[in-house]
Amino acid sequence: MSSKSKNTLKILFVSAEIAPFSSVGGLSQVAYFLPRALLKMGVDIRLFTPKYGTIEEKKFPLKKIIDELKVPTDKPNESSQPQELICNVKVIKNPKKTEPVVYFLENMEYFEKRSNVYGYSDDHIRFGLLSRGALEFIQKKLFVPDLIHCNDWHTGYLLNYLRQNYKDNPLLKKISTLFSIHNLYQGNFDFTHATELDFDDGKSQLSSFFSERFFKQNSLKRGIMYADVVNTVSENYAREILTEEYGAGLHNLFKELRGKLYGILNGLDYTDFNPQTDKIIKKNYSSINLHDRAENKIDLQKQFNLEIRPEVPLLAVSGRLDEQKGLDLIIETIDFLLSELDIQFVVLGGGQPKYIGFFEELEKRYHGKVGTHLMPNFVLPRKIFAGADIILLPSRYEPGGVVALEALRYGCIPIVRATGGLADSVVDFDPEKGIGTGFTFKKFTRENFIVAITRALETFKNKSVWIKIIRQAMQQDFSWNKVAEKYLDLYKRASEFRKESLLPNPPMALRQIVT
């Protein structure tokens, strides 16, 4: 059991990826920064994640704390498959007191032998093992949490197991739960085109790990159903997923359970992302001494082989080049803008070949006006945020939108489609009031996008107004400390929900799905 005070809130944060041990997408960054912010606030938060074969044990030496943890697979007696999968649990040797404890679930077949975090045909088994392994770990009583914080479809199984298979377990049944949805990906099976025979209503018992039925049971859906509280990574996205357009086939379920659905915008590490101290950029600056920012623009122009023209508006795209990010809209627009206006344009990121080919040709046609780096890079984004005037983010949908937060921090003004987290993080500039941190548009059309860009470029001509927008952008507070406070509120709501649901006659609102 924890050595901390009995009154200390104890959280087990379960995630398929956690930076710096395993990092594929934004989830790993949330799993890194949010627990650290909560730890500073006095929460006893610990993490539970697979021990993948890619984790460098020289860099992160581990010690075993549980040997041969038996995780049930629920396989039928007549099956030749194992009834249990044997795992170990490890922790980092000599961890820093400023960092949360991380428990690594070790299994040779499903984690250790795999070179990637995702992308396997048996991912449903792998994350079923993670989910049930976490519950078996808790029963060893090395750490018994008050709440389990689950993330994305990989851990939806855990919430289902907890409320069905372990519903009468005296140690587990009182534990409250929060399910954070970072995106609506639902695993390898295509649930949106499932036949009537394959439809999963979410109420049946989870099948054996090795059965075809388990593959077709929707972990994300079940996590939503069985969690005490559900949140997405922005308030606006929480509203959007109630609609057919954004709900990925789950909009009716979200509407049914909207009473327990919340949105919290992700944060940004203001110590790491700090233009005053950032060693990556050419010249440090702040919202007060913005004149130093100009050196970064010249540096960016040199880096991308552009003409050195500090007075020309420099527009940028940074991130994954795919349809979700609105690349089709950029392609429909950018050629016209470059031919008609005196602007420069840089593109950074890897992605779909059709987009890469387009930007390669664009750079050839507009030599000196267009620069590209068409592969992922972890250094250049900072240089773009510090040197570009405008970042283009015309996403089709965007649950969180961390690129906008990074750009705002460095005074690179976003032009965004007002969707998901982008609508929550960027304030459309109002010229009459002089208030705003960027430029927004709603309809996903070329015309609306061009209007937003035109508004920004016209405003750019008025240097005093543009500097005011930059200052307002840089002074926004999206720190993880603020985010952590909001998660604490959700933890309290989840705890209240669990206590009420355990009453002999729970309120009708709590009898939603689980009976």
Predicted feature descriptions by range:
Residues 1-515:
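Catalytic cores of nucleotide-sugar-dependent glycosyltransferases that transfer UDP/GDP/TDP-activated
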